[in-house]
Regions:
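Short gly/ser-rich loop at a beta-strand->alpha-helix junction or flexible surface loop bordering the NTP-binding
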Residues: 1-60, 180
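Hydrophobic alpha-helical interaction segments
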Residues: 66-195
């Protein structure tokens, strides 16, 4: 509820939005706030209240997909479900990693909260085609229903190989279908599905 007073424009995003939508059982100790405003510091701690805010400065073209919600009588801006998922594949370091991004994708699609065409539209607007690589690989791994969008994603891959998990070491096999370095094992990525 403090975020609107700290920076404008703003939106609760990444791990905080994943938690709000119930796409992760993890409870982030930091509130992640997306903004286009340059700040002197990316982290703000309010010690008296025990709060930590992490500001993620985005290019204006990446600041979209927002909605308003009400929490305890306060209007809050938050990324919508599709933008939350896409943001997490763009910057996994702000959502707890690629496994948390995969959980978000799985929940959003299986619960019908996002449509595959909306994901395609948002990734295209973001301008980071590595998102298609990461999402495509995980959609196939988790056998998620995205229909013909999967083929659209494959047609729009960026050149070269990207890392599946930018937070993990740069090793592991190469996947030529999705042009990814698989630096996380399928078992690691799906372990949460069996618990």
């Amino acid at each position: 509820r403090i975020a609107p007073y700290l920076t404008e424009p703003h939106a609760i995003a990444y791990w905080s939005a994943l938690h709000h939508y119930g796409y992760t059982e993890q409870i982030p100790t930091t509130t992640f706030v997306a903004t286009t405003a340059q700040r002197g510091s990316t982290v703000l701690e309010i010690e008296e209240l025990g709060l930590t805010y992490r500001f993620v400065v985005l290019a204006a073209r990446k600041f979209f997909g927002l909605r308003s919600i009400w929490i305890e009588g306060e209007e809050i801006t938050i990324t919508d479900q599709a933008k939350t998922v896409v943001d997490c594949f763009d910057r996994p370091e702000y959502c707890g990693g690629i496994v948390e991004a995969a959980k978000g994708l799985h929940e959003a699609l299986t619960e019908g909260h996002v449509s595959p065409p909306q994901l395609t539209e948002y990734v295209t607007r973001m301008g980071n085609r590595t998102i298609f690589k990461r999402m495509g690989y995980l959609v196939e791994l988790m056998a998620l229903p995205v229909g013909q969008e999967l083929q659209r994603w494959r047609q729009d891959l960026s050149a070269g190989y990207g890392l599946l998990d930018p937070l993990a070491s740069d090793d592991g096999p190469y996947d030529s279908r999705w042009q990814l370095r698989l630096n996380r094992s399928p078992a690691d990525l799906k372990d949460w599905m069996v618990h």
